[in-house]
Every structure is written in C-alpha cells, then in structure tokens.
C-alpha cells in the first residue's frame, strides 16, 4: 500500500467510497485509512469526486485518537486542501473539521456572515419547507421517551387512519370456539355410547346387530339335551355336543363355549407355559450353583454389610468349612521353594486328601455345601490316624512324630470340627465391624482370583480383617488356614533343563492370637496328583 501510485489510490478510493446510495462514511473505513494511504490521499485529493471527498472527511471522525495523533500533519494538510475546494459542502465540512486533529473537537462556531454557510442553510430551509412540518422530528427523538419528546417537540398529531379492517368482536370468537368444543364432545359421547363390547377382540368399534342370526352356532346342529337320542354315543351317556367350528371361515358375533372345551383350549397353552418355565429353571439352576456371592456375610460378620442385606442373611446358619487347617512348620512358602527333579516324599495326593466313602455315618450330618468340595491339602497332619472310625465321638487332630504319611490312607481329621463348632458361634452376640478402604480393595483383589474359597470362608476372612477375633474352631488352635485358589504353574528345574508342572495352592492364614494374617503359596508336584 505504501508503494501505491496516486492514480491507484484514487481508483481504490472510488471503489470503496464512490457508492451514491450511502452518503455517510461507514465505521469500517477506519481500518483502511493507514499512514501510507493518508500520505497518498494528500497527493491525489484534488482529483477525487465531491462524494468521495465528503466521505473521506467524515471518515476521519471514526479514527482512534491515537491514530489521529500519529497522522496529525497529514490530516491537517488534507483538511487545508478541502478548504480550497470548489464544492460548498466540502468547504463547510472542512471548516467544521478544522480543529479536530489538534483538539479532538468540532468547530461549531461558524460565522453567520460566511456566504458559503448562508447559501447551504438557505437550500436546506427550502427543502424543509417543502415537507410537512408534522412529519419532521428532531434527531434525538429515538432516544427520548414519550413525555420528554412531548416537552421538546410539542404534542404529536396522531397518524390519520385512512381505512380500518372489520373484525369480529372477541365475544363472537369465544362463542364460536365454545360451540365447536361442545360439538366435538357430543360426537365423542355418541360414538362411545353405542359400543357394548369389542367384536372378537379386533379393536373395531361396532354396534350390536340383533337382526341377523349368530354365525358362530350353525343352524343344522342345535344344542342337544340329555333326552335327545344319539347314534354315535351310548344311550347311558348323553352329554351336550359342542358346536362344530370352521377354522377357515372368519367368525363373527358371540361364540358360546362349553366349560370342558374351555379347559381343552387353555390346556395346551398352560402346558407350553409350564414347559418353558421348567426349561428356564433348569438353565438358571447350574448358573446359580456356580456363582459365588461375595457381598453376603454370615451372622458373626454382620457389621460388614448394610442393614438391608442383614434380613436375608440372618436365616442362613453359619458353619465352618472343611478347609480350616492348623498351621504346621512343614509349609513351604512361595519365595523359598527350590524345585528339583526329585519327587518330595511327604505330601499326599489330592485323592488321598478326600474323606473316605466307607464310613457313611458322619456324612449325613454335614451340610450340602461342604459335601461338594474336598478338604484342603494339609501337609502337617498325619493321615495314618485310625481314631476317626467311630462317627459319634468328636475327633481331635493329632500329629504323632516319626510317622511317614502314605497316599493310601486318607486324612479324616478335617471332619472333626463340623459336629461341635457351629453351636457357640451362633450364640455369640453380633459386633459392629467395618472395613477400611484399603482393606476393601485388598479383599476384592484377593477374591478376584479365588476359585476354591466358599461363601462362609469369605465371610470369616472379611470378619477377621475387620477385627473379629472369635475363633470358630478353637480345637484347631489359634492359627487357621483357608484355601483361596488352586492353579498350575510351570517352574524351571534346578539344573536348568526343562520345567516341572506344579500344583499351586494359595492359602490365607489367620492368627487369632496376634490378629495378623498372611497369604502364601503351597507347591505340589503334578506327578502325585492323578
């Protein structure tokens, strides 16, 4: 723009400001009047048209004060050139803007003896006198309210109404609306009053037609009485024969059915519904047995749950599981286990840890939830104890020294706490127990991978973590172990050649004497497990 020639500047100004439909300079001109443009305008101002000169002079009023101060000399030169112009309007606007670059105010002290101003005012008075005086309002009328405008300009004459639309009164409109609403309501009542029933349940509103015979009952087969003879039925058994039905014909009207026929019609539907209900129960039953509810707790951990869940848990008896085992020093922790190619001689197999099926007397006393799973592996108990042969006497687990465990005799000492432990647990009063946020997260993480722990065992673990120190099996000692999960792992051998598949049991150990709990792993070789 700085290198623009004078002719280019003049053509550019004519394109921007040469429109005759708008005689005022728009505010957007302020962004176009830069310092370079003002310098070029000063050189080509005398060649511009009168309309462009007027808009350019009026556009300087939109410039910011900082821009006016920067371009004061150029603006004063342009205004000085405008005072020498031949157009009277350009001369008058230049006289008004004479003091604007210096003081920022307009020069309104125009001399009355100035012939140019006198000529322009005379032309304006002639133009105003030609117009009707009542239509002329001051420029500030749009900023004044009615009272202030009346005080300034006097009473305003109302506009003359040359014609007026003929409209119905409001009462007539309301009367027509009420009449239409009453007509619609009467039609709806008349339509609903003639419908005594739905024909065949099709949803069609029809009136009862009493002139035509009913098509549901054929004329050729009337109702038979007990005295009417029948060729196809024995004489001693005379019952009314239901009317024959034509399934392909669309029946209308009222159909009379015998009670026996109603039973036969609904029997198939009832049988189908009952069969569907049985199928859904069969599908849902195994899923319910496999699902372990982790949120429910028994009575001795009732403080861990909300009062809404407590009502459903009070009716369930709390029994210790068969996997409570006293701690023994023969447990190998997960961190200290060194796998070797030799087979350990001590641990029995999983088949040997199951209770024998020969003594059938103690099995009816056990709950069903403990019959379905085998007791946890315990390497510390002696499986050769012959004492549990009598089912009536309570058994006490003993560990005699110098006895080598064998895989043929199963350990049955796990069944001993089942006969006498539940009674004192149910009689003890409830305590308000609560878990911290960290304990809740730890329990959730622990139960997420637990595939062997039962619902009572989970409740016992949560109660111990919350602060319960009531030992459900005092006969087994202060330390109780609960089997959480069971899985297999491939561990490398000690010599580094190959790997051995081990059966890993994750065990949760609770010490009721110290209040501490730990979690560790037990390893068993897969060669001993069939």
Swiss-Prot record:
Matches recorded under Pfam families: NELF-A_N
Region annotation (NELF-C/D-binding) ranges: 125-188
Molecular function in Gene Ontology: chromatin binding; molecular adaptor activity
Region described as Disordered: 213-248, 266-296, 312-409
Example of a GO biological process term: negative regulation of transcription elongation by RNA polymerase II
Cellular-component GO terms for this entry: cytosol; NELF complex; nuclear body; nucleus
Region (RNAPII-binding): 189-248
Keyword Plastid listed: no
The keyword Hydrolase appears for this protein: no
Modified residues (Phosphoserine): 225, 233, 363
Basic and acidic residues composition-biased segments: 277-291
Main location: nucleus
Occurrences of domain HDAg (ranges): 89-248
Ranges of biased composition (kind: Polar residues): 225-238
Tissue specificity annotation: Ubiquitous. Expressed in brain, heart, spleen, lung, liver, muscle, kidney and testis. Already expressed in 7 dpc embryos.
Superkingdom in the source lineage: Eukaryota
Its job: Essential component of the NELF complex, a complex that negatively regulates the elongation of transcription by RNA polymerase II. The NELF complex, which acts via an association with the DSIF complex and causes transcriptional pausing, is counteracted by the P-TEFb kinase complex.
Record family assignment: Belongs to the NELF-A family.
PANTHER family in the cross-refs: NEGATIVE ELONGATION FACTOR A, NEGATIVE ELONGATION FACTOR A NELF-A
Domain text: The HDAg-like domain is essential for transcriptional repression, and mediates the interaction with the RNA polymerase II complex.
Designated name of the protein: Negative elongation factor A
Gene of this entry: Nelfa
